[in-house]
From Swiss-Prot:
Taxonomic placement: Eukaryota, Metazoa, Ecdysozoa, Nematoda, Chromadorea
The protein's name: Transcription elongation factor 1 homolog
Keyword terms, alphabetized: Metal-binding, Nucleus, Transcription, Transcription regulation, Zinc, Zinc-finger
Main location: nucleus
Cellular compartment(s): Nucleus
Molecular function as annotated in GO: RNA polymerase II complex binding; zinc ion binding
Encoding gene per record: elof-1
Residue sites binding Zn(2+) per the record: 26, 29, 50, 53
Family according to the record: Belongs to the ELOF1 family.
Gene3D superfamilies from the UniProt entry: 2.20.25.190
GO biological process terms held by the UniProt record: transcription elongation by RNA polymerase II
């Protein structure tokens, strides 16, 4: 009498992680992909500026921060300024 064959599952493939954007739409001039983020990890400051209308913003960052975090802080600061 023979032993039953065991069925082995195929190894799962790792899903590719899409990189996050570093260029965003400007909330002031409404141009697409003109705001560029620069992260200064040594000084813990994130800079974002628009190449068209020259608007800029800077905020404090930490070791977990990504460019999208700087952009969202900028949009939140714009909304607070409009509501105040």
């Amino acid at each position: 009498m023979g032993k039953r064959k065991s069925k082995r599952k195929a190894p799962t493939k790792a899903k590719a992680v899409m990189p996050l954007d570093t260029q965003f739409n400007c909330p002031f001039c409404n141009h697409e992909r003109v705001c560029e983020v620069k992260m200064d990890r040594e000084k813990n400051v994130g800079y974002i500026s628009c190449r068209v209308c020259s608007e800029d913003f800077q905020t404090n960052i930490n070791y977990l921060s990504e460019p999208i975090d700087v952009y969202s802080d900028w949009v939140d600061a714009c909304e607070q300024a409009n509501n105040a």
